[in-house]
A protein has these predicted regions:
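PP2C/PPM-type serine/threonine phosphatase catalytic domain
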Residues: 1-306
């Protein structure tokens, strides 16, 4: 399929912070020239040099994505190469700054196979369809999500929980490749003209809930007006707040449903039916990082007497 995009709009605001730890690509409120990919990163609050980490990852990943052939499908294997480049850029940045730096990640890209999305942490990715609402919303890699899933706290309690901003997956420099966190990967070919994709840091979602976002983004206003409304509501957030909004102008598909012939392992012809079904895959392959997040959750639960 061929996906044509409208003019993207974005914002990057300080909120009530003194320094800016968010970074976006492209780094413009209205980029005059843009690639078919978009990135938003949030330097982890409280860690040294978060602003360096977010910029290093966004720019390192963007440089690698510029070498991708978007006229074919973009696979998780392709993304691993891009992710490796981002980690390399982060490791290099850490040689001149603090090794304690870290950042969240959100990335979307449009290609022949549809739209691929990857994320780590509590920055989010949304896919909206104006007449249907939210088609996809990423699930935060956070302590509070683990507690909600475990039934320790309710969704309502999570909104004001003191640990709601503790994340358990992020990008941080390391000399050991096996210690690198991996993202959750989501891919869909269910894309129509008028669909809107939205990336943002938690400085936005801390002050605007999903229902309000849906009301604004699925309204009849222009994309620029939608961006302006979200920026206005996020302006006084306690945290840096950054977002990118991009809508689909046109989708030219080959065949939405088609079959292909191939040989199976026994040399027999088999027929596969290909449908535009969204696919979500967790690329976290390092159990030690998952276990460390689990141990952190247990420790905080003990401290808070949950």
């Amino acid at each position: 399929m061929t996906i044509q995009l409208n003019q993207p709009f974005s914002f990057c605001q300080l909120g009530k912070r003194d320094n800016q730890e968010d970074y976006r690509y492209p780094n413009s409120n209205r980029p005059s020239d843009f690639d078919p990919f978009f990135i938003v990163c949030d330097g982890v609050g409280g860690s040294a040099d978060g602003e360096i980490a977010s910029r290093a990852v966004a720019m390192g990943m963007a440089e690698a994505l510029k070498n991708v052939d978007w006229n074919r499908d973009f696979t998780p294997k392709d993304f691993q190469i891009v992710l490796g480049a981002a980690y390399k850029a982060l490791d290099h940045a850490a040689t001149n700054a603090s090794s304690d730096m870290a950042t969240t990640l959100t990335m979307i890209c449009f290609h022949e196979g549809g739209c691929s999305m990857a994320y780590m942490g509590d920055s989010r990715i949304y896919h909206f369809r104006p007449n249907q609402g939210i088609l996809y919303c990423s699930s935060d890699h956070s302590l509070i999500n683990e507690l909600v899933f475990a039934g320790v706290v309710s969704p309502d309690q999570a909104l004001s929980h003191p640990q709601r901003n503790v994340i358990n997956r992020y990008m941080a420099p390391t000399s050991d490749d096996e210690e690198r966190c991996q993202p959750t990967w989501y891919q869909t070919s269910d894309i129509e003209a008028g669909d809107i994709f939205f990336l943002c840091t938690d400085g936005v979602t801390d002050v605007i809930d999903n229902d309000t976002l849906e009301t604004i983004i699925c309204s009849d206003g222009s994309d620029e007006e939608k961006r302006d409304n979200i920026a206005r509501l996020s302006y006084h957030s306690d945290d840096n707040n950054t977002a990118i909004l991009v809508s689909v102008a046109q989708v030219i598909k080959k065949e939405e449903y088609h079959t292909s012939e191939q040989e199976d392992d026994n040399g027999q012809d088999t027929k596969r039916i290909h449908r535009p079904t969204p696919v979500a895959v967790d690329l976290e392959i390092n159990e030690s990082r998952n276990l460390s997040g689990y141990r952190v959750m247990k420790m905080i639960k003990k401290v808070l007497n949950l």
